[in-house]
């Protein structure tokens, strides 16, 4: 009996050790079922799942692991499907591989949805391809923040390709959600559609490119570096309470029906439009007045025109305080600023103490400089010309009389020299006559 009990105890201990051994090592998966199982079994200590083969998902997988910062290492493999793949409620990081969807439906979908306070990071070795087939009539985004998001975070260090990039649901009213782009979004449609409230940062090294680079309809957008680019032809915005309003512009600013206000800060980076597009387009398609829409351009390089539609023109939403432009943007200059013209480019500078350059308006110059108006209506700053008169110094005696100059006067010397030469000439001629 004792031997039997000892054997049972040994088996239990062996099973326990096996369980601990599994928990201490990352899970390896090779198909949809083992992926789902591994996600369900993940713990704070055992939080990494690694693919050993390509995985096809025919239905979405929920990631909802409280207290677990899940890491899915794609292992250089691909997770593919034809619709929503991941419904995310807790922190997850994808790295080292590809997530690929080809959609063939009529509704609008996202490959990955963030919910609540979910946090998603796409590392720099990840590609998310959110494509659609030729027969699809609905749009597909790679990542979306769902309408219940609060303190959700999306960080894009990798690359997004396909139909559209990332979006914030338009019904979100809390300014607690965060989108950070350090990587690349290169798509056919909208690279970023920021319909709802949140804070979005575009940083150095980022590339945000599509028919429309970014359309923001609520919240805050900070362009701190990188490139935001449009590849399309500009189309005037139209009212739309459930979708995008315009295309063909690198940066589209159009307040939503939710009337939550917009602040855009262009601090650095490049904003580029195609030849028939616009770099920046601001409008008020929902007739909200535009008083709470602010677009501040303090730096960067803007290639393409700035279009402020009549619907928002009275609100004067654009204020240029710095940056370089391919077009004349003097009508958008903030107070105290002026445009310096350098060939085919214009740079916004402070209109004070200007000592050189050509400008689109008359600049303010200090003493010793003048402004010359050119035939093309521009103004050039030049230094005022003058002459220098040399006044030799003398020593003054105590009786008030002046002594001889201390400094050699070249003018007087020349005069004396000429006089002596003339006298010598007369003497020489006179002597010759005497001979």
Residue locations for each model-derived region?
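Sec-dependent, cleavable N-terminal signal peptides
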Residues: 1-24, 434-435
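Sec-dependent signal peptide cleavage junction
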Residues: 15-27, 403-410
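C-terminal low-complexity, Ser/Thr- and acidic/Pro-rich disordered "stalk" regions positioned immediately N-terminal
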Residues: 368, 375-407
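Glycine-rich repeat segments that build the extracellular carbohydrate-interaction surface of secreted
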Residues: 41-57, 69-77, 158
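Acidic Gly/Asp/Thr-rich repetitive segments characteristic of extracellular carbohydrate-active
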Residues: 24-52
């Amino acid at each position: 009996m004792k031997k039997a009990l000892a054997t049972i105890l040994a088996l239990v201990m062996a099973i326990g050790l096996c369980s601990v051994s599994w928990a201490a090592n990352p899970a390896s998966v090779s198909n949809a079922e083992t992926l789902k199982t591994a996600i369900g079994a993940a713990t704070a200590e055992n939080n990494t799942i690694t693919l050993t083969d390509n995985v096809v998902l025919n239905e979405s997988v929920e990631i909802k692991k409280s207290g677990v910062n899940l890491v899915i290492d794609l292992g250089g493999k691909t997770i593919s499907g034809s619709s929503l793949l991941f419904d995310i409620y807790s922190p997850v990081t994808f790295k080292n591989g590809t997530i690929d969807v080809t959609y063939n439906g009529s509704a609008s979908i996202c490959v990955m949805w963030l919910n609540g306070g979910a946090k998603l990071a796409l590392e720099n070795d990840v590609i998310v391809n959110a494509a659609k087939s030729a027969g699809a009539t609905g749009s597909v985004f790679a990542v979306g923040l769902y309408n219940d998001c609060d303190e959700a975070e999306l960080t894009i260090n990798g690359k997004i390709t396909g139909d559209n990039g990332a979006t914030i649901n338009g019904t979100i009213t809390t300014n607690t959600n965060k989108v950070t782009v350090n990587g690349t979004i290169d798509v056919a449609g909208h690279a970023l559609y920021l319909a709802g409230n949140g804070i979005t940062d575009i940083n150095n090294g980022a590339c945000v490119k599509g028919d429309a680079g970014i359309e923001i309809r609520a919240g805050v957008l900070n362009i701190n570096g990188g490139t935001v680019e449009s590849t399309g032809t500009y189309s005037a915005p139209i009212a739309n309470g459930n979708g995008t309003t315009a295309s063909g512009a690198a940066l589209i600013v159009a307040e939503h029906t939710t009337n939550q206000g917009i602040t855009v800060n262009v601090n650095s980076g490049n904003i580029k439009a195609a030849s028939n597009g616009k770099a920046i387009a601001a409008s008020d398609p929902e007739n909200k007045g535009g008083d709470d829409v602010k677009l501040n351009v303090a730096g960067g390089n803007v290639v393409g025109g700035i279009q402020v539609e009549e619907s928002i023109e009275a609100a004067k939403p654009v204020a240029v305080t710095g940056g370089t432009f391919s077009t004349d943007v003097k009508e958008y200059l903030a107070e105290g600023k002026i445009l310096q013209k350098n060939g085919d480019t214009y740079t916004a500078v402070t209109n004070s103490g200007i000592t050189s350059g050509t400008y689109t308006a008359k600049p303010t110059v200090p003493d010793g400089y003048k402004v010359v108006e050119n035939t093309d209506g521009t103004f050039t700053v030049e230094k005022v010309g003058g002459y220098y008169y040399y006044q030799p110094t003398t020593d003054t005696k105590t009786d008030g009389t002046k002594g001889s100059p201390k400094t050699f006067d070249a003018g007087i010397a020349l005069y004396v020299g000429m006089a002596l030469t003339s006298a010598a000439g007369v003497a020489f001629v006179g002597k010759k006559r005497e001979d």
